[in-house]
Amino acid sequence: MYFSWAAGSRKPRRLKAGTSGIELLQAASGEHHSLLLFSNHRVYSCGDNSWGQLGQRRDQSTERPEPIQALNDLHVDLVSCGKEHSVAVCHKGKVFAWGAGSEGQLGIGEFKEISFMPTKIKALAGIKIIQVSCGHYHSLALSEDGHVFSWGRNSEGQLGLGKNSRSQAIPQKVKSLEGIPLAQVAAGGTHSFALSLTGTSFGWGSNRSGQLALSGNKVKEQIYKPHSIGALKNLSVIYISCGYEHTAVLTEEGQVFTFGGNSSGQLQPSPRSGQRGPQLIEGIGGRVSQIECASYHTIAYVYTTGQVVSLGRGPSHTSNPTHQEAPAENSDITCLLAAEDLVDIEVKDIFAGAHANFVTTRRVSHTRSTGVSMKILPEIIRINQSLVKKWRAANKRKDREGAKREISLIFSSSACLTASFLKKRDAGENNLIDVDLKLARDVFKKLTTEKWISSLITTCLEEYLLRDLPYSSPHQEALLVFLLLPECSIMQDPKNWKTLAFEFAKAIHKMGPQSLAFLRTCWASLEVSSLNILVQMLKKAIISQIQYGVATEQYITNIKVLLEVIKEVHKANCQLPESAFIINELSGIFNFDAEAGRMFIRHNDLDCTESSDMVVFSDFLFVFDLPSKIKLMKCDSFVKLMSEVMAFPEKMSSPPYLILKVRRSHLVEDTLRQLRQVEDFDLRKQLSVGFINEIRPEAGGVSSEFFHCIFEEMTDPKYEMFIYPEKGSSMWFPVNPKFEKSSYFLFGILCGLSLHNLKVINLPFPLALYKKLLNQKPSLEDLKELSLPLGRNLQEVLNCEAGDIEELHMYFSIYWDQKDVDLIPDGISVPVNETNKRDYVSKYVDYIFNISIKTIYEEFHRGFYKVCNWDIIRQFQPEELMTAIIGNATCDWKQFENNSKYKDGYDKSHPTILLFWKAFHDLTLDEKKKFLLFLTGCDRLHVKGLQNEGIVFRCSETFSEEDNPRSLTCHRMLDLPKYSSMRRMKEALQVAINNSTGFVSQE
């Protein structure tokens, strides 16, 4: 049973469909015609047929509904009417159109003025359409896989195809909506809407009467592409309906908001004068579950009272007001159906038209139903648990074919994939990440355990989804797929790096600033597990490209894209440790010589075209481990040196080394004097040091022991260049230096030279120094490293309860390095209390690490970067820079043994060698370090040598058992006599350990 109101009628007609068991499923109305779809999926039409809109073979109008014979053999699922055209969607989503077509609104490929018979829209063949909505002269359709199509007139931008797009006689994809999981499309007179599954409303077309609810100072009259409507963002919209020049939206709470033209009172009974934008319809008497707009009126089903009400000029009015007219006088809310009209029945659906309204009903077994009649719309396909279960159990051919179709649809569509994992959004809630990534990961894991499903998903991603990723979309919901895809294990498979991971990265690389900014914001708030999955996927792709790629133009493009994308993730990272981005494999597979060449070309701009496209890995140091960073630092230094030689050819004749000749008894004095005279160019050369009367620098020098000795002297507390707050603590710069500031500049150069020459030094600074070198701010934790008692005291100040801190009698005045200092003006009279204690601690730390040493630290900083390149060093972490300079005090001594080499008749199984390693491993740690000092000139290993350094054993024929071992420190060579007993071996090792300082002449 259903009710209808035709033009001129004041009361509803109560009708039956006729044949027993046949019910009215849907009604649609144009300006002067209607379509009725019954439960047997037959379509009837009535009204004006001047433009063939009834789909009848003859052109006469009819008041009684008559079947559309051309559709009798088709299983019609839904219908829609424009002003003078009609559209029907049949089984499997085939679309037919008829009526007026001069504006292209039929979508049949031509601007045919009249089409009396339903014609199949061929452009949509093979696409399953699940929703269709007609405006006056345009049509919208939503497909099962989430695409929106539009066709017809585009005078006001109502097709959403862009400003320069004309009217279309063939359905066109609305590309601006690609990737958005949509719930509904709705067409009005000259405007259009789409509603996403998360409740976001998108509007486009005419806004001349405010029907798009745009806000702002300069509201546009037309929008040519879908625009997210901010005024509706927090309303939790679940349904949208459009009239000629007005729009109504229904919320989860059962409220109705209207906006647009109010020429016939279609918005609300008492429109607020001058107000634009969504207005709540008040006085409706309850909660609403359905709304529908006709051209100039709005109807609603108030389920809490059982009423169907109307606002505006309904079918009983025949005038044609324009939006300039004042609201109709009789614009109160009209009750079309009251609860007493619905005895033993309840409202199922409501339909509104310019000349007719319809209400369908269904029987209830009791007088008061507890259910809520909602408008149920066909939805885009998406994954759910029952589908996953069905797919995994699909063993029969027929079942598997159906499963393949469903899987292919979902995994070929960004919108469907996103829709599958949307989170439930509460009213007014605005989630940044609306998808459940953990659920996605679990579902993908279940699916990919089935080989046939895994293979099919791979094909779909490769051939469809990744090629059409919505990277240019301005809408955030479309970009959620970029968070979902890495969760699929198929994307992580190194075999798929080129077809999947790279294509994914390429889409991100193409993004505009706005889209990329949103993605970065999402990355910054991802759970650690999801962010790590993304990083590991990109790392695997980079490794695969370097391992298997040939240095072609495509190789350069691929690696540049991958590195740029992981760089964006790195910049956004707030949670993962820096080590997560390091690609440890690079040190073994990367060509550092080729990198030096690329750096040289770019630095000297030798080929502008090649230089602009070149990948220079030193721009991405965060993916390199510490040994590789140091190698790249050496590459950079070599490039700078060669570049200067190219610019000034006369420098070619200068010595290839920076040579220092020093006296052991005047080590610091001789070194600083010569460094004052060194040109910047020479600082980038390899250092060669010779001790006068001991070893010539031309013979190879002894740089390791030189650095060990000079830093041992200059950092000695007795030298008084630095202060030690406590005995055995780290050292720091003094407040009142006893040396000229130039000495700290030269000390900085020495530190830079040690790093440049890969020589580790004993530099007992806290981590704070390395933070300052990297322009990072030292903290209270760093102060604890410098002075543990002071750091603990300040921590206790922070931990003090409000009433206890005043009892400490502390003021903004401190004592540091034998000097009283006010942290603020007149700090001696400003007590520390609960309010200012954090400021006190902050200023204390800042004074020690920054303010008190500003002048001499700046000199040190300047000296260090006189040798080292800031662009390279800045990409080190403080801990890495510290390790690069002071080396590793710990060593894998077994690995040290395995790395050793043997000459002059020695091999690893020689009896003397077996004795040596047995005796060596029996040494204490301190003894081993002293032996290392004897062997290399330093008691610790440089990070570059941890994996590779060992001893080079040799034995001269002139040696006897009475001789002691000798070392060549620059080559890690040990001249070891062929001892035959453990007693003699241990005795010889003790001689070496106890004589570990001093240079040994080279033969």
From Swiss-Prot:
Its main location: cytoplasm. It is found in: Cytoplasm, Cytosol. Keywords: Cytoplasm, Immunity, Innate immunity, Repeat, Transferase, Ubl conjugation pathway. SUPFAM superfamilies: Hect, E3 ligase catalytic domain, RCC1/BLIP-II. Signal peptide: none annotated. PANTHER family: UBIQUITIN-PROTEIN LIGASE E3A, UBIQUITIN-PROTEIN LIGASE E3A-RELATED. This is E3 ISG15--protein ligase Herc6.
